[in-house]
Each structure stands twice: as C-alpha cells, then as structure tokens.
Amino acid sequence: MSIQRRSLLQALAAAPVAMPALTGVTSSLAPTASSAASSSPKQPNTYQVKDFGAKGDGTTLDTKAIQAAIDAAAKTQGTVIFDGGVYTTGSLFLKNGVTFRVDQGVRLQGSQNIEDYPLLPTRVAGIEMTWPAALINVYQEQNVKLTGDGIIDGNGKVFWDSYWNLRRQYDPKGIRWAADYDCRRPRLIQFFEAQNVRIENLSLYRAGFWTVHICYSQDVTVYNVIIRNNEGGRGPSTDGIDIDSSRKVLVEKADITCNDDALCMKAGRDSDGLRVSRPTEDVVIRDCIIRDAAAGVTFGSETSGGFKNVKVSGIKVYHPTPVGILFKSAQTRGGSISGIEISDVFMQDVPVVMRVNLNWYPAYSYAKIPEGIKDYPGYWKTLSTPVPKERGIPQLSDVYVHDVQAVGAKTAFEISAYPEKPLKNFRFERLHLDAWAAGSIANAEDFSFKDVTLLSLDGKSVDLKQSKNVRGL
C-alpha cells in the first residue's frame, strides 16, 4: 500500500515520541522507476523531459535534456513534467514563469561529479565568491514554482566525504576556518536574486551542502517539504533552510532531519557581510518539525547585515537536536538583531532550550592565515580582513519569547553577550521548562520574565552575571 505524503506528515506530528523509527523514513518513501504508477499525463503547455531526450534510467546524465525542456517551457510560461524514473543530472536553471513538477514516482538525483555544477558568482557562508551552482537554481529569475510529491536527491555522500578528508588536512594546520570554502560542494536548491518563488510538497534528500538557500531574494514560500539529509551518513553543513539577506519569506510545515542548522537566518559574514549590509527581514516560520539537527531555530552565525521582524511559531524540536533556540555570532560579525518573536514551541529531550553565544566556534569564526602559507585564494584575504571591535560586536535587542514548553532538558538558558553591547529588552512569557539546571544569563539589560515555570532538578535558580534590571526570575 502506498503512503501518501500529507498523511505521513500528519501521522508523524501526531506521534512525536517515536523518533527512532523515523530515521529511516526516507527509505520507505523513496520512489523508484518501478514504483511509478504511470506516465505523467500530458496536458496543454506541458513539456515532458523524455520528449527532449531524457532517459530517467538512473545512470544517463540527463542534464541537457531536462534543461532543454525548461528552456522550452520558459517561452510559454509552461510546466516541466517527468515520467516515473530516476533522473541523474547536474545543475539545472529554472526560468521566469516556469513550473517544475517532480511527481510521485520521480527521483531527481544529483550527479556526484562536481564538474557537472558550473561555477558562478554567489554567496557562500556569508562571503560573496565564485562557487558551484546548486542542483536546482532559480538564479535572477521570478515567478517560478517547484512542486510535486517526488524526490530531489542531492546524492551528496561523495561531497560529505571530501569535506571530512579536507578537514583532516586543514585542522592540524590551523586553517579549519577555510575548509568550508575550499571544499566545493553543491547546494541542493538555491534561490539567488529571485522573486516570487514557491517550493511545495517535495521531499529533499542528502544535500551535498545546504539544502534550500534563499539568498538576496524576496517573496519566497517554502511549504510542506520533507528534508532528510542523514540517510547513509551525517553530512557536514547540510543545513535545512537558510534565509540569507532576503525579505518577505514564508516557511511553513517543513519536516527536517539534517546535520546542521535546521531553520536558519543569515546575513553575511565579517568585513564582506558588513560591506554588503543587507538584512534578513519580514520572515515568518511556522508549524515545522525538527527531528534531528544542530539546532532547531538559528539566528547566525552570519549576522553582519542584521535581522529584523522575524516571527517563528508552532515549532516542535526533538532529541537528538542539542539546542532548541540558538543565537550565534562572533566579535567580527557585527550586525543588529531586533524585532524577533518566537512562540508556541515544544521541545522534547533537547539539552539546551535557548542559547545566545556571540563568541561561537572560534576555530571557524576567526580567520587567520598562518605565516608559513604564502599561496592562497583571494577569498582567504576577504575572510581574514580585520573588523574594528566597535563594528564587530553584534547587538541583540527586542526579542520576545513566549508559550514555550520543554521537557527533559539539561539546561534552560545559556545566554551571554559582551559588556560593551549587552543584550537588551528580552521578554519571556508563559514558559514551562523542565530542566536539570536553570543555567545562566550574562551581560543582559531589561529582561522580563512573566508566568515562567522553571523546574530545575538541581534546585538552583538562573545564575545572573553582570546584568541589570532583570525582573520576574
């Protein structure tokens, strides 16, 4: 009996405790050529990729044929469709007005040859640079829709392995910070300088790098997607959905398993991010499930352009995700974060409920070229350009967290900032937190707690350090 995708999501949401059984859900969901019930019906203004020479046999590289169908559809604002099968492809570029439909029984599978992903100007981890295109690109286009109940599979393990191999070389040399940029890996989907774009109902597997990257874009909707990046390993940097210096973005009903940040706001890194100075703003994230990730909802670490007017609600976060709500940055990032509202969050066995760490991961955050290295790419210089301290320390203010329940946590709060720029005007209301320890708050001003129940098993209250006007604890 086939399992319908929406029914699966409803069933998973209704039974959150049974997490171990969900780790292999993608295997049972994975359509193959033999599972396709029939060919997609040909409708007016549709473009069947097999009419352009695509094979869908899992081995033939179908990039040119699929791109030809996309280009033809762009002339009439048409729809690209697939018969059931496994289509191996390199980078595809969707065009204005195109609907790209990957139906049930179709798997679009990424090539494992990095040469099949052409280099192009983009932004990667906060730096503008040349980098391989994503598997699916909406690059300076508008009015594009990705839809269907099928699978887009990055087939990314070869890229995960190449990253870990490079880390083994770089870490002993003190250049761990460079590995993420030097190891070129394709994202699964990127919207770059795009407008009025929608992705819905798809299952996204095994991204080689970030899964959905929304960069310099506006009016973007991500709806009812399943992300499963931990199949066959745990891929590094396999963020779920990254919203990067973009505005008017809605993310709704995403169900995510990954090995980095699940839902993440970004806005540029250090000197380059401060130069671009483009915020992420007017973002709504709601009704999402985080099953396994580095953090549930993350702001940073690329904070240089700032974040404002971000509303997150209806989020469920489960073990083994280590942090539910995370603000992370560094003293070279800068940027202003304000107007953040986080509500209606449930966490089960998540070790840390909320963390603010503005000196996050120094080996990655602070780029310094060792004296013995003379030959290096230009972006190393960009990464290592000094940032004056007065510009480098980020400012966080006006954060409202309410209606949060956490059970089985180790620590409720791990919150700290710099004395030069303390955290300001945080409000916490209607929290019910069951944790081993209450935790600590440092360098905070004007924090208020109302209707907060904190059941700390060690019997201690929150440790306040270098803070003033903290009320209600």
Q: What do these predicted ranges mean?
A:
Residues 2-473:
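Extracellular/periplasmic carbohydrate-active domains that bind, remodel
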